[in-house]
Amino acid sequence: MNQKILTASLAALVLTTGAFSVQAESTPPNFYSLNEVVVTASRTPKKKIDTNADVAVVTADEIAQKHYDDVSQAVRNIPGVVIANSSANGQNYNSNKLYINGSNKVVLLVDGVRMNTNGLTVGSSVTLAQHVNMNSIDHIEVLKGSASTLYGSDAQGGVINIITKKAKENQINTAVTISASSFDGEKYNLYNEGNKDGFFWAVEAQKELQGDYKDGHNNKVISHLNAESYNVKLGKDLGNDSSLVFTYNKYKSDYQRPDQAFMHTGGGSTTRDYGTKDNDAISLQYKAKITDALSNELTVYRNRTTFRDNYKSAGESWFMDMKSTGFTDQLTWKNDQHAVVGGIEYYKDEIPYFYSYASTSGAQGHHASNTAFYIQDDWKITDKWNVTPGIRFDHHSTFGNHTTPAITVGYKANENTNYYLGYKEFFVAPDLYQLFDHYSGNKDLDPQEGSTWQIGMNKQIDDSLSMSANLYRTHAKNIISYSFDTWKYENLGKTDSAGGSLSLTKQFNPNWSATFGYTYTHINSSDSQKANLNGFLPKHTLDLGITYVHDTFDASLYGRAILGREGGKGFTGRIPSEYKNYSVWNFSMNYKPVDYAKVFFKVNNIFDSYYCDVGTFTASTTDWYSMPGRNYELGVTFQF
């Protein structure tokens, strides 16, 4: 559909629905309070204020208010989280990066099912931007800090758990969303959920189009996207809190990206690189309540990605097929004093096909597997004191046996205040790309090992104000990083990192609310890199959000400021100021003229900031991937 026709049609819909305006009760935004229940930190339901961890939550209401396009946008403004894209969104190319507490070792779960494919990208084994079906999400839990005992070695930085919706009994709901946006953007989404006679389901389909964009200096940047995604969840309630759930997720896209970008020189590449993605994931999950105290959860899954980048340039193409298969079997036993979680976890990563720069040598045909046993006891010693010891045993097919203990002590000062202190060890095996890529791979890599200390608090200061604060210190040896001296992945010795974050949520009255976040990050420098991963991570990050709700209208203003991101070693004098320090502000508003329709309008990058998430990798070039300037989106959602 031509975008001008789509925009005009949407405007007509807005005017039509507005003619039947009705009033509704004023409701405050649904912040996830400290008394709500989360599951990711301990793999058992627990009030957030009682969780001995730093957990942030993004609710379905927040997603609906701010119209996040994908999961990466939803978690981008959480203190401690850094998202870095080399395009308008993370769906172009495959080197987008995710960091939590300074580490890119993050586990992604959907309803507790592992979605990682180790070696999938240069930056991370997690591709949040491809999780675009947002209507099916109930909330997103972000666990910040090492969680290796329960989730494995690649949870050094933390865990992101996407919890999907389940329709209420005897209900069927349908939503249709259509929107048009700047840069020839179009989006069409259909969502249906239901729960009848013990069967429940959720089905979502989305089509998204986007063209070339202009950055904050009005430079044209090559960027094309034609993406389709589908989610299916089918479940059966078996009675006695038991269920069987099947899920299937599909993502497919054609994209274009610039061969190079020159933010520093104010120009841009005119060479288009063409790529495709074809990813899917399938899982089966069985939950059984054996007794009042004992329950079991068994999951089997398979994740697959097919990636073709720059396929029209045979000498510079990069193709990669990856597959991860695995299962988990967990037992949970509870009484008044103990919540014991134990289980077995197995996964296998493999690269069936690999082609890079006219060669299939190296990574193709390689695979690695990991088998783990874990146990953790959340022991309530008194009404105020609790301790959570845990241990994990891993057997890696290449790197052998490793044991990682953990312990956390919690002190519940009163009903509104909880303190915790934790120590956790981790073991991170090199992924297949780091080991076997024929250009940058290094078969002599050793696993990265280390430990993290963490101290924090969760406090409900009064009925309208809550706070979470956290400090951490990590020591690691055999750091696995790309070396610009050898042009390969190397073990770069030891490093220490430290940081912390503060989150505040304030409800001023039924109409006005605000959030504030601050993050500090410091990672020691080395002989080959500057501090903070060669100047990639900012020293300071500020997050601020303000929301207004009244009757059928709501609006949100939210932004992030990046401060003290210095850039890599050897870049002195050529690093744009927009890379070191910048802020980006967004605005969204919603109006519900009738019960069955909601009109929304969104402005991204209100002040037309000129900035980039990702800088150049080497000192010999001037590649700076500038991000979109001010842009708009207008849409409507119909609910049945």
Protein language model regions, located:
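Outer-membrane beta-barrel signature, preferentially recognizing the C-terminal barrel domain
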Residues: 264-289, 416-418, 424-477, 481-507, ...
